[in-house]
Amino acid sequence: MHHPGPPRFVATGDEVELAPRDPDPTATYTWRLTQAPAQSTVSLGDDPVEHFVPDAPGRYVVRLTAPDGEHDLTVRAFPGTLESSGTHTSGRSGGHSGGVSGGRSGPGRSGSGEYTQAGDGSDGGGGGQPRLTLRPDIEGDEAVVRADCSPHPEGTETAADLAVEFLLDDRDDVDADAVTRDGTALRIPLDALPERARIHAVAVGNHGYSVPDAVEFTRGGDGVETVTSGAGVAARRPYDAPAWAEDSVIYEIYVRTFAGERDESPFDAITDRLDYLDSLGVDAIWLTPVLQNDHAPHGYNITDFFEIASDLGTRADYERFIEAAHDRGFKVLFDLVCNHSARTHPYFESAVEGPDADYREWYEWRSDTEPETYFEWEHIANFNFDHLPVRRHLLDAVAQWADLVDGFRCDMAWAVPNGFWREIHDYCKDRDSEFLLLDETIPYIPDFQAGLFDMHFDSTTYAALRQVGGGGDAEAILGAIEGRAEIGFPEHASFMLYAENHDETRYIVDYGREAAEAAAGALFTLPGAPLLYAGQEFGQRGRRDDLAWDHADETLQSFVSDLASARHDQPALSADADLVRIPYEVRDGPSDRVVAYARTTENDAAVVVLNFGSEPTTVGLPAGTDGTDLVSGEYRGAAGDGDATVTVDSVSVFPADENDLRQ
């Protein structure tokens, strides 16, 4: 179906990309407005991909005429004085919830995020964006959606000050007259439910509106969160990350150097190390790009989106690796590059010949011979997503690789139109609701939670870890985590935590062994899925060099494995556990090199102490904290002054009584 997707929530002045889904490049697609606020003067052009900018608050309905019929899309525009969570981001995808890519500066690369004190994303503390999570249920003969609203953490509003605006999905045949709304709840009689019904909403305050959320009801479906009724209706939350992903230990492999000095094909080398990765505690494996490219070792300059790189092997070799990984219970992530191709791609080599050349419209251009790109990268050229053949080509590639793997790590996600990611999200989720979409966006963008991606690179915590490693106050990492809510991420958002990757200098090189251990401890004990970059676990010093397997630091290796075990074994360290600030006293060593915090669930609690300093530290913790370290298994208690006193080298996790933590 060519329908352009879910309704959009935007502010006036925001740009909405209008594009047919599953496009046929040879077909005709036209757009027209069928409803707009009385004061609006906006109009649409004649292109198959249009860029629509609401100019007045209110509701718009845009109609697409396509080969399979007519499709309506609702766009709800709020006054431009209201801010969405995208307002304080920069770069190509920094618009609001319905926004499209725009601008040319782009966010930074993986390591260029700069940590600032949490709260800087608000409007000064008086308002800011609220947050929203929708809860679906079946009550008697009704499908019910309840909205849990939270005001901005630093704002003056309360939950009672917030309104909720619901929109039915234009793709579903729901009788609007049968729907009732009661404050923060929406109800649909079960006998009025079609085969599929999707409901979208935002929370609206005096200063902003939230990241949209959605729920879905299906008849006879297999939703992730299912409630059974006599009518056989299933309910799910389509914007949640897959359950397997939230607590996965993700392992990034730089494909061409993983084997080290062994004379072995890359896929065979990785397969041979699967038992090692299992013993390390890894759950998911992310390979850097494996497609045919311009021979740059990183693989991000693609020359064929449908073929495995010849220096890595064949498609059959790749599939054998995936099968072996799946047999051992690993998930496999494919590094998906959509923003650009290499300049040695045959289509670009044709396009650059002149303004009338074949494939000229496939790319964006600065001049007759110079394509658009970012950061003056000279080996790539940005695709033109207004050209339907580009979208078709990339969607076909997505379909080919999605059938093999368990998720996509989406390269330069900020540089690709939001609407295109929404289409990929819906395509992947419709075929497998447990498929993962992980975005590389620096800095992260809260609106990307709204049906674009399931999990986000936590570049803010990354930057805080780097600042702490360089001598900053260790409590900065708590501010970084709390900052997620303060810039608008809802409570159901998921994150990937990292201290290094293929774009960054190794943490151990910049800050030393002790700080590297503490940073690893942060990854495994803070809310989010921890990422290990291959070699990080044994002290590899080169960023993209051959892995020095024969010189691995086995003590560090064992330490990281113990961290992974603690993460898997302790419910209080799970992604869903609360992060709680606690009182603590550093009694030996520099106090700003140490941070302590608690993780709690309804039935479990643990206290974490991280020491970024070069010497062991003694710390006083709340009474009720057990001195047995859940990472090492050693008793770390020491004589104290009536509280729990412990000695910590770099990382320790202690069982605790939640009732004592908040006193």
UniProtKB/Swiss-Prot annotation:
<dbReference type="GO" id="GO:0009313">
    <property type="term" value="P:oligosaccharide catabolic process"/>
</dbReference>
<dbReference type="Pfam" id="PF00128">
    <property type="entry name" value="Alpha-amylase"/>
</dbReference>
<dbReference type="GO" id="GO:0005983">
    <property type="term" value="P:starch catabolic process"/>
</dbReference>
<keyword id="KW-0378">Hydrolase</keyword>
<dbReference type="GO" id="GO:0004558">
    <property type="term" value="F:alpha-1,4-glucosidase activity"/>
</dbReference>
<dbReference type="InterPro" id="IPR017853">
    <property type="entry name" value="Glycoside_hydrolase_SF"/>
</dbReference>
<comment type="pathway">
    <text>Glycan degradation; starch degradation.</text>
</comment>
<dbReference type="GO" id="GO:0005737">
    <property type="term" value="C:cytoplasm"/>
</dbReference>
<dbReference type="GO" id="GO:0004556">
    <property type="term" value="F:alpha-amylase activity"/>
</dbReference>
<dbReference type="GO" id="GO:0005980">
    <property type="term" value="P:glycogen catabolic process"/>
</dbReference>
<feature type="active site" description="Proton donor">
    <location>
        <position position="440"/>
    </location>
</feature>
<keyword id="KW-0624">Polysaccharide degradation</keyword>
<protein>
    <recommendedName>
        <fullName>Alpha-amylase MalA</fullName>
        <ecNumber>3.2.1.1</ecNumber>
    </recommendedName>
</protein>
<feature type="active site" description="Nucleophile">
    <location>
        <position position="411"/>
    </location>
</feature>
<feature type="region of interest" description="Disordered">
    <location>
        <begin position="80"/>
        <end position="135"/>
    </location>
</feature>
<dbReference type="GO" id="GO:0005977">
    <property type="term" value="P:glycogen metabolic process"/>
</dbReference>
<feature type="site" description="Transition state stabilizer">
    <location>
        <position position="503"/>
    </location>
</feature>
<feature type="region of interest" description="Disordered">
    <location>
        <begin position="1"/>
        <end position="28"/>
    </location>
</feature>
<dbReference type="InterPro" id="IPR053556">
    <property type="entry name" value="GH13_alpha-amylase"/>
</dbReference>
<keyword id="KW-0119">Carbohydrate metabolism</keyword>
<dbReference type="InterPro" id="IPR013783">
    <property type="entry name" value="Ig-like_fold"/>
</dbReference>
<dbReference type="InterPro" id="IPR006047">
    <property type="entry name" value="Glyco_hydro_13_cat_dom"/>
</dbReference>
<keyword id="KW-0326">Glycosidase</keyword>
<dbReference type="GO" id="GO:2000897">
    <property type="term" value="P:amylopectin catabolic process"/>
</dbReference>
<keyword id="KW-0963">Cytoplasm</keyword>
<comment type="function">
    <text>Alpha-amylase that cleaves starch into oligosaccharides, the first step in starch degradation. Endo-acting enzyme which prefers a linear polysaccharide to branched polysaccharides hydrolyzing alpha-1,4 glucosidic bonds efficiently. Also has transglycosylation activity, but does not act on alpha-1,6 bonds. Higher activities of 100%, 79% and 67.8% against amylose, soluble starch and amylopectin, respectively. Lower activity of 22% against glycogen and faint or no activity against alpha-, beta- and gamma-cyclodextrin.</text>
</comment>
<feature type="compositionally biased region" description="Gly residues">
    <location>
        <begin position="92"/>
        <end position="111"/>
    </location>
</feature>
<comment type="similarity">
    <text>Belongs to the glycosyl hydrolase 13 family.</text>
</comment>
<dbReference type="InterPro" id="IPR013780">
    <property type="entry name" value="Glyco_hydro_b"/>
</dbReference>
<dbReference type="GO" id="GO:0016052">
    <property type="term" value="P:carbohydrate catabolic process"/>
</dbReference>
